[in-house]
Amino acid sequence: MVKMRIAAVSAGALCLASCNVGPDFAPPNSGLPNVPFASAASVTSSKEASPSTETPKPVDPMWWKAFSDPKLTSLEQRVALANLDLQTATLRIAESRFQRGSAAAAELPTVQGDAKYQRELYSQNGIASLLGQLAPAGSGSSPSIGALNDYTPGFDASWELDLWGRVRRQVEAADAQIEAAEDQRRDTLVSLLAEVARDYIQLRGAQALLNNAKENLKVEQDLLDLTRTRQEKGLTTGLDVENAAAQVDGVRALIPGFEQQEAEQINALSLLLDLPPNGLRGELVRAGAVPPTPARAPIGVPSELARRRPDIRRAEAQLHAQTADIGVSVAAFYPTVQLNGTLVLDSLTFNNLWKGSSVQYQAGPSVSLPIFEGGKLKSILELSKAQQQEAAIAYHKTVLQAWHDVVNAMVAYRTEQQKRSRLADQVAHSKEALTLARARYNDGVADFTTVLDVARTVLQAQQQYVQSTVNVSIDLVQLYKALGGGWEKTYPEAPTGAALKEAAN
């Protein structure tokens, strides 16, 4: 019978120990379909073929390699090692883990040791004078107390039994906050990878525009020389010479602006890699081609966004944390059971301090139950529920925004490719028109104004084509950023454990 009672008590204790009040978290349904993204071509003319298409194949975690640019790949690898924003996000992971350790410590007993020594002398006119009343009648003397030594080392221990899961819910919320911090770092990394690619592409675009301006300057200078030669022969007037000179000056004026853009983009990349201004100039000042886009871009399916985009993952982790906080608020309505104990050695002499007769202790449980809090606990609970609902709405909005980001990026990528194709045709036609205009001018059939107008059209068409080429590559970068790729294989991976502690110190 005794064994049965012991078993029943043990089973009850285990049940209480495993009790977690409040709702258990269930991962939300993102609502994203497991089918390919709707074709962005539906918003463009069906008669035009797109130079590049998207495929439902999985997104390459190292998407920047699709541009086949070794310099870009090198920059992407280095930014995760050097960027200051990423280092800050890494330290926030460490902070979250330390906060989790602080919350988990409440599951364990606390033990405090203390030791005290006092030398005491009581006043003979104070409470010690009452001892005179204890002296035998007729003794003629009264007892007195001299100086005393008091040695009292000891230990205090307490342990709150987490019967309702309050501490376990706090630890659960802290674990979710760690996940949120890790996904915040991933989100920072995704943005950095995209920013590096965007700045690098813009740098190559500025260099391409600079080279284009220099080439057109040579063309315009040739026209000016030709016009002066014709003037010397009496075949044209000074007006044509001045118009040609003005055209040369106009093209020459474009060069400083492109040089400024080049310097700004190099400095932007230097900042991302924690380098001083012009820190990458020696490496990047030599002009290179704008990174070309691949023939086919794998983009996966919408349902993969919930697992790949860090902002969606972070929103889910924050929803998890808010759900666990409801359990913490519910547990506040239940009794708190605590085991307390005190062990002290008390002696007036050091020699007797370590004897068994010097031991004194107190031990036993204590129970506290909220009876009247003026509605405080209920308000805290309702606040936790409202915060959980807010987190659920934020999750839904994040998912919906991610879907829109991808579709909008697809549309931009497709339409810009079509624009670039048309601009390529314009460049080809305008160059041919310039050749014909110069020939007719040399033959005296066309005036010089026609040549200048066509030359100006060539320059504008070439600049627009270069800018469109830049935009196509940047739109693909934006598409991959919207897809959330790039954090799965980082340089380096987020440090954990001892590395985070060292970073925090």
Placement of each model-derived feature along the sequence:
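Terminal intrinsically disordered/low-complexity segments used for targeting and assembly
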Residues: V2-V9, C15-L81, A128-G138, S144, ...
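Short flexible linkers and secondary-structure junctions
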Residues: N20-E195, V337-G341, I371-L381
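Sec/SRP-type N-terminal targeting helices
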Residues: Q87-T88, A104-A105, L161-L189, L239, ...
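Short sequence motifs at beta-strands and strand-loop junctions characteristic
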Residues: I145-N149, S357-V359, Q460
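Hydrophobic, lipid-facing positions within transmembrane beta-strands of outer-membrane proteins
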Residues: N149-W159, D199, V301, Y361-V367
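Periplasmic alpha-helical coiled-coil/stalk elements that build and connect Gram-negative outer-membrane
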Residues: V167, D183-V301, A412, E416, ...
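A short glycine-centered flexible hinge/capping loop motif at secondary-structure junctions
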Residues: Q231-L235, Y441-V445, A482-G486
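Alpha-helical heptad-repeat coiled-coil segments that mediate oligomerization/polymerization in large
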Residues: G234-T237, A402, A409, G444-F448
